[in-house]
């Protein structure tokens, strides 16, 4: 075979599929080592304020790559595109990865896309807190290859929370429970009679209330109930809500009865200073709890203290959202709820549970809580931009700023 024929075979080896069947797409992504919930077909339904396309990449008629591309339409017929946690391909094969990326760029140019933002599900470094950070050679090589292919790299930003994720691995579950601080927090939650409830759409209202409380407390805009509903409906039994709750009225009645008993005992031991001191301390504690629950017990029989929304997809899972009623922060319910949510993810077949982003400095408040779960800090390689029209870079930069707002 002549050299020219070999070159032609190499060029025609790959084929981009621009209308991949949804079921075929999802089957490929869900079982792929680099697959991700945010690249699932269902995520396109959740992000219903975007258009979307399912791309496939074939090698000798075999599907070897896929990408769910979210699309926003811009003035004058232009588009902005986003490939969350993708594309999906064997990133250990640099040649194939770059070829797929170039094919996406060429296709995007034909669609008049000014920018294609993507953040592959590739680890640059993975380590437990306190361990040495060792950078993956594969990750470094991939960054270099994508840059050479024309992608603009933004991964150096340590303030980008989506780049740093706290992940719990199934084999580390026993180590979580050996932590002294964690055990203490669980003991408080148990003493406060925090109960666990797993639910779905039937408790959407309670979850949304907790999220709205969190939104108000943090002074940030969060999703509305319809968004959480779409996630639960889209992923069905793969998704769940997990709550921490207390039998509020029952607890209040018990506190009242115990407080009355303590008052009676105090009246009968005026000449026993040590016993009185102990009883007075107990009375103060009971009175504090009484005052804390008095008005709340009039409003509701059961109080929902905190809740999370989680989804299992393939061998991974994500705790996507978490809300809390700050009035019950002393109950330490999140420790118990997150633990049970992680266990539930593993029971549904996941091997890893992603607790969400943390600051790259590893010193933020989020990590103070998440660090109790012995997580692996998965430092992904970060975000890239493809610019199909490089000469329109200034316009593309404005689109990028717009995209950061829109992709939420």
Regions found by a protein language model. Give the residues of each.
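A conserved beta-strand-loop-helix scaffold within acyl/acetyltransferase catalytic domains
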Residues: 17-77, 123-125, 129, 137-139, ...
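Active-site/acyl-donor-binding loops of N-acyltransferases
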Residues: 22, 130-173, 347-408
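Short, Lys/Arg-enriched N-terminal segments with co-localized hydrophobic residues
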Residues: 1-12
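Catalytic phosphate/metal-binding cores of nucleic-acid and nucleotide-processing enzymes, i.e., regions
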Residues: 82-84, 310
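Conserved acetyl-CoA-binding loop-helix of GNAT-fold acetyltransferases
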Residues: 94-106, 329-343
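A short, internal acetyl-CoA/4′-phosphopantetheine-binding micro-motif in the GNAT/acyltransferase core
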Residues: 86-93, 322-331
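Structural preference for beta-strand elements that scaffold enzyme active sites
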Residues: 80-82, 115, 241, 316-318, ...
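Conserved GNAT acetyl-CoA-binding A-motif
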Residues: 109-127, 346-357
């Amino acid at each position: 075979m002549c050299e020219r024929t070999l070159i032609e075979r190499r060029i025609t080896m790959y084929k981009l599929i621009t209308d991949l069947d949804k079921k075929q797409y999802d089957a490929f992504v869900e079982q792929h080592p680099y697959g991700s919930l945010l690249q699932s077909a269902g995520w396109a339904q959740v992000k219903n304020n975007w258009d979307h396309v399912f791309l496939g990449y074939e090698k000798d008629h075999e599907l070897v790559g896929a990408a769910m591309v979210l699309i926003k339409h811009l003035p004058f017929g232009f588009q902005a595109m986003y490939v969350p946690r993708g594309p999906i391909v064997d990133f250990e094969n640099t040649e194939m990865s770059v070829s797929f990326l170039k094919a996406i760029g060429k296709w995007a140019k034909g669609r008049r896309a000014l920018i294609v933002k993507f953040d592959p599900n590739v680890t640059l470094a993975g380590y437990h807190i306190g361990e040495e950070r060792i950078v993956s050679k594969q990750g470094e090589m991939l960054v270099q290859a994508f840059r050479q292919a024309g992608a603009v790299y933004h991964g150096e930003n340590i303030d980008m929370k989506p780049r740093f994720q706290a992940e719990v691995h199934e084999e580390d579950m026993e180590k979580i429970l050996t932590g002294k601080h964690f055990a203490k927090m669980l003991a408080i939650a148990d003493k406060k009679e925090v109960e666990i409830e797993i639910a779905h759409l039937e408790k959407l209202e309670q979850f949304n209330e907790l999220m709205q409380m969190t939104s108000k407390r943090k002074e940030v805009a969060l999703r509305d109930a319809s968004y959480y509903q779409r996630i639960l409906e889209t992923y069905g039994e793969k998704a769940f809500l997990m709550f921490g709750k207390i039998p509020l009225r029952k607890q209040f009645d018990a506190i009242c009865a115990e407080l009355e008993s303590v008052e009676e005992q105090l009246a009968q031991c005026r000449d026993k200073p040590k016993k009185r001191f102990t009883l007075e301390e107990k009375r103060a504690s009971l009175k504090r709890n009484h005052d804390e629950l008095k008005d709340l017990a009039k409003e509701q029989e059961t109080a929902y203290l905190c809740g999370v929304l989680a989804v299992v997809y393939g061998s991974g899972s994500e705790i996507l959202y978490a809300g809390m009623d700050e009035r019950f922060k002393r109950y330490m319910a999140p420790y118990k709820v997150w633990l049970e949510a992680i266990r539930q993810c593993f029971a549904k077949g996941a091997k890893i549970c992603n607790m969400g982003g943390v600051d790259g400095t590893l010193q933020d408040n989020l990590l103070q809580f998440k660090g109790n779960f012995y997580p692996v800090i998965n430092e992904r390689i970060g975000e890239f931009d493809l610019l199909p029209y490089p000469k329109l870079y200034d316009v593309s930069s404005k689109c990028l700023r717009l995209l950061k707002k829109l992709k939420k």
